[in-house]
């Protein structure tokens, strides 16, 4: 983001602007491209510079749309929990009812945690027990120190940009349906997540973990295009997947339950390979994540796996990108030669650039 801001500042300087507000409305600086098949599109009402110097501009602060952020649950309820935690120096819990109109729930609280404590924050400093239907972008961008536990369901973009926080979504105890057979969160969950954890006691919609680059997640089923463009992180899928799994996946690792040995039919194998889960590290990783899933959600399916783990682990497949696997193998090799992790990564990169060890 720093580099994006610097480049933007350079462009603004070339145009003679000091602030973004000064730029808004200056359509006289835009030029229409001459594209043959779009000649019929009339952009005159957008590009007409007649209004560029009009006294009444749409970007006048007095006319800015009021998002009523002072009325959202973060402001009215959750920030009090941060104040309490700061004063008591103890972990704090709070319960709240949510509805599907509560968009970006937890995001404002997360920003205040980051401003107040930075990286020096312990896990689960504030735990929010939410009940009901989460709105879009539930838990977006939340940092380490914040845990959101939702009993109910949630809309699209859950955990978008997750940045170290923890998200738990589980079914109510009184539910009569099987969690692993029902969708509990919407599409594009954990989009662009960089770190943190998510445990989903049910099925996710499409594009689960698209562009995930560092978060750990457990889910009991997914729709189409799961793991799309993933560059890092760990994902365990305990149920059915849709088509086109791992399209464009260049990093990270996924472990997928494949009892019918038909995952290869749904896998986009252009960049990835799949194999049995039989190495000690992989077995340990899968078990630990399923144990966490059971601990946080009480998932019946997780319990089923844990009760007969030796049998079920043989039905999982490991998905890993070809180049990512090569790099991980190189890092492991240099660590075995006595280098620490950072040094091993540097040597592995240099070796990869040269084409081998």
Over which residues does each language-model region extend?
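Long, distal/terminal scaffolding or interaction modules
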Residues: 1-18, 24-27, 48-357
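Polar, glycine-rich mid-to-C-terminal structural blocks
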Residues: 31-35
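Juxtamembrane/interface motifs at transmembrane-helix termini
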Residues: 43-45
């Amino acid at each position: 983001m720093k580099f994006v801001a610097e480049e933007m500042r350079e462009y603004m300087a070339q145009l003679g602007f000091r602030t973004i507000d000064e730029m808004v409305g200056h359509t006289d600086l835009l030029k229409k491209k001459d594209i043959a098949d779009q000649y019929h599109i009339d952009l005159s009402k957008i590009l007409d510079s007649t209004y560029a110097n009009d006294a009444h501009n749409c970007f006048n602060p007095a006319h800015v749309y009021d998002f009523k952020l002072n009325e959202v649950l973060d402001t009215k309820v959750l920030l009090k929990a941060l104040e309490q935690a700061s004063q008591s120096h103890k972990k704090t819990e709070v319960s709240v009812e949510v509805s599907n109109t509560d968009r970006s729930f937890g995001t404002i609280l997360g920003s205040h945690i980051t401003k107040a404590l930075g990286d020096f924050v312990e896990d689960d400093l504030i735990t929010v027990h939410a009940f009901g239907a989460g709105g879009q972008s539930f838990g977006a961008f939340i940092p380490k120190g914040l845990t959101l536990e939702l009993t109910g369901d949630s809309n699209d973009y859950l955990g978008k940009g997750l940045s170290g926080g923890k998200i738990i979504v589980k079914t109510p105890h009184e539910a009569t349906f099987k969690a692993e057979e029902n969708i509990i969160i919407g599409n594009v969950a954990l989009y662009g997540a960089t770190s943190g954890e998510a445990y989903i006691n049910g099925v996710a919609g499409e594009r689960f973990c698209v562009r995930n680059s560092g978060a750990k997640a457990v889910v009991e089923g997914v729709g189409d295009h799961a793991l799309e463009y993933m560059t890092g992180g760990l994902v365990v899928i305990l149920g059915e997947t849709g088509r086109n799994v791992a399209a464009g996946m260049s990093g990270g690792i996924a472990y997928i339950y494949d009892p019918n040995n038909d995952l290869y039919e749904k896998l986009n194998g252009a960049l990835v390979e799949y194999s049995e889960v039989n190495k000690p590290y992989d077995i340990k990783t899968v078990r630990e994540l399923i144990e966490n899933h059971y601990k946080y959600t009480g998932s019946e399916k997780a319990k089923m796996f844990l009760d007969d783990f030796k049998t079920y682990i043989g039905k999982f497949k490991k998905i890993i990108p070809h180049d990512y696997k090569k790099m991980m193998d190189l890092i492991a090799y240099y660590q075995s030669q006595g280098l620490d992790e950072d040094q091993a990564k540097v040597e592995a990169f240099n070796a990869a650039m040269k084409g081998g060890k």
